[in-house]
Structures are given as C-alpha cells and as structure tokens.
Amino acid sequence: QGWTVKAVLNNDIVGGSCGSDGHCDDTHVRVFSEGPRADLSEQARAAQRRNGGENDSPSRNLSRWLDNLAEQDPAGVDVRQIWRADRMGRGGDHIPFLEAGYPAVRFSVAVEDYEHQHQDLRVEDGVTYGDTVDEMDFPYLAKVTRLNVRALDHLAGAPMPPAPTAKAAVRTFTEISWDRVPGAASYRIWQRRTDEPYWRAMPASVVQASDKPDYSIDLAGVRGDDWLFGVSSVSAEGIESPIASAVPGGGYAPLVSE
C-alpha cells in the first residue's frame, strides 16, 4: 500500500510476571531484536562482513532506543535487551516483518509461565493449564502498555531515521554523509567503539537542517577503523528518532526497495 513503516512493536506475551518455576519479575520486560538483518542481499552481507555492522541492524538500534526511553520513566518497567531475533526455538509475529525488511522487535515478559500459554484449559496431576485471567498481573501489564504508548508517541512525532554512510579508509578523519529527512530540524551524529554495546551518552556533533538535499560532516582526528557511527534526526519539537548506523544495511527502509 506504499506505507512508510518506521518500526513494528510486537507484544507477545506481556500480561504476567511469574514464571513456571515460581520466579517473579515485575520490573523488566524483554525486548528481542535481530542482529544481521533478515533481508540482507549477498552483496550487502559481504560488505557487512568486511566493514562491520552485525550488531547494528535497525531493529537492534530500535531496541537500544526503547531501552533509553524506558529509563526516562522511573516508575515504569525497565527494558532487558535480548540480542537475538526471538526466544530460542520459537517464533513470533514480528518475524515476517523482519523478513520483509522492516525494523521490528518483540516485547515479552521477563519470565515465562509455560503452563499458561498455548494450552487447553485442563488439570493434570494437580497442575492447572491454560490462559486464565487469574494468572494476569494487571499492574505489570499497565507498565508495559505505558512504555508501548510512549514509544508510539515518540516514533510518530519523530522524523524517519536517516540512512548514513561512513568513509574513513586510509585517512585520519571520518566523513559521515546522509540525505535530507523530511521533517527533521537537526541531526545528531553518534559514535561508539566497535566493542561497545551502547552509543555514547552525548552526540559527537549536531548539524542543523536546511533545504539542501544532502549533508556531510568530517570528524577530524577520528580514525574510522576504531569506531561505529550513527545519525539520528530530530523534529522541531525536539523529538528524536532512533539512531541509524552508518554500516551496510543500517538504514530503516527495506533493502529490497533499493
């Protein structure tokens, strides 16, 4: 239908806080995100293998963004990032979106209760099976819902993330380039060491938007071999998009459309 999809948030399962073994955790929600994106072409996969980016898919950066957003709500639920596409040996409704090239993550409870999911209502050997309302933790569900609503509000108000590239071969500086993003009032350039899991707390630079079709900035003295780079777009109201990494396949659009 020609829609632009910024992100897909799949919530499954998010209503309980106690697991099959009786362990309870009502302070975290797990967010699953893929590493190398599912729609990489062989050419893009080869480029990523040489230049890095296996931990910088749009979905992985969406997960980082959600983690930061959750930290801004002390009374809410904390995000536990799970850096795999889904639970071991299982799948979810976000997977087809990933395969189509759309950034997608899965929200799921911190601990699973296997007796009360995908089960017919019954009692066996004294154990009650089935999805029943008495197993719900509604205050926990409310916190997960609040995080989702805040995420949707921010995603709707933010411009699309850019699609940056980084050039740093055989030079003592790094050039970051990207095309203009409609609705962006400014852009923030981010960096982190290649072995760091999270972006630095402060941007490396800020570029104000204009009417020109593309942008480029040189980071003097920054040897690109040692760093990963990203760019986020910011609306006039100050709402920031997730970061897009300047790596092969780092943009948020499906690669099949390129």
PLM regions: where:
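Active-site-adjacent mobile loop/cap segments within catalytic or ligand-binding domains
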Residues: 17-30, 82-159
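Proline-enriched interdomain boundary motifs that mark the N-terminal boundary
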Residues: 158-168, 256
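Conserved aromatic anchor
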Residues: 172-184
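Extracellular fibronectin type III
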Residues: 234-258
